[in-house]
């Protein structure tokens, strides 16, 4: 998979991340309220952000679909990332996301995630999408609920964070059958 499709929602454009997104990403990735909740350390320099974007771009070489930049249409600002990772073609993937704190509470991630989930089930032919979040990340848990994912259980001591702290994580899942039944009922 060389290029991700460009996906549009009412307020957002989801497109391939690029090195040119580094200044916008660095702006939010330094925030201690964002990275640690997603399992990564706050960025310490723009060079670190550039390196991480490089890793995102390299993930395609390992067979991952890639990372989408979440771009706000109103100002063309990159305000977050969203991706399907731990991808097994035709079977499953995990959904991950991060968003600038300035845009929390506006329904941005659910809006972006709906487009990615549709792409995963319809275009990639996935049978299952999972989301894992720390048990105390209430905002992310709320996103899972809004999206219609089912809480499947807690993996006790299931996540080793960048700083060596071990956390319990909650696993949410959605199958293709659930997704297509849900979307059929919305029509």
Predicted regions and their residues:
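Acyl-donor (CoA/ACP) binding surface of acyl/acetyltransferases
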Residues: 1-35, 67, 71-187
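Conserved GNAT-fold acetyl-CoA-binding loop/helix
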Residues: 33-55, 66
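Juxtamembrane/interface motifs at transmembrane-helix termini
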Residues: 44-48, 56-58, 72, 100-101
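Short loop/turn motifs at secondary-structure junctions and domain boundaries
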Residues: 59-63
């Amino acid at each position: 998979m060389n290029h991700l499709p460009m996906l549009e929602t009412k307020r957002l454009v989801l497109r391939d991340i690029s090195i040119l997104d580094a200044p916008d990403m660095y702006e939010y990735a330094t925030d201690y309220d964002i990275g640690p909740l997603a399992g990564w350390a706050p960025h310490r320099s723009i060079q670190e952000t550039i390196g991480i974007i490089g890793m995102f771009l390299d993930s395609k070489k390992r067979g991952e679909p890639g990372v989408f930049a979440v771009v706000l249409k109103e100002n063309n600002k990159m305000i977050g990332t969203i991706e399907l990772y731990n991808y097994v073609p035709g079977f499953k993937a995990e959904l991950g996301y991060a968003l600038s704190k300035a845009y929390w509470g506006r329904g941005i991630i659910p809006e972006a995630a709906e487009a990615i989930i549709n792409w995963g089930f319809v275009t990639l032919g996935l049978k299952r999408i999972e989301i894992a979040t720390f048990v105390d990340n209430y905002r992310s848990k709320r996103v899972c609920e809004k999206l219609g994912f089912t809480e499947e259980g807690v993996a006790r001591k299931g996540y080793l964070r960048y700083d060596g702290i071990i956390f319990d994580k909650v696993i949410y899942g959605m199958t293709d059958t659930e997704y297509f039944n849900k979307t059929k009922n919305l029509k």
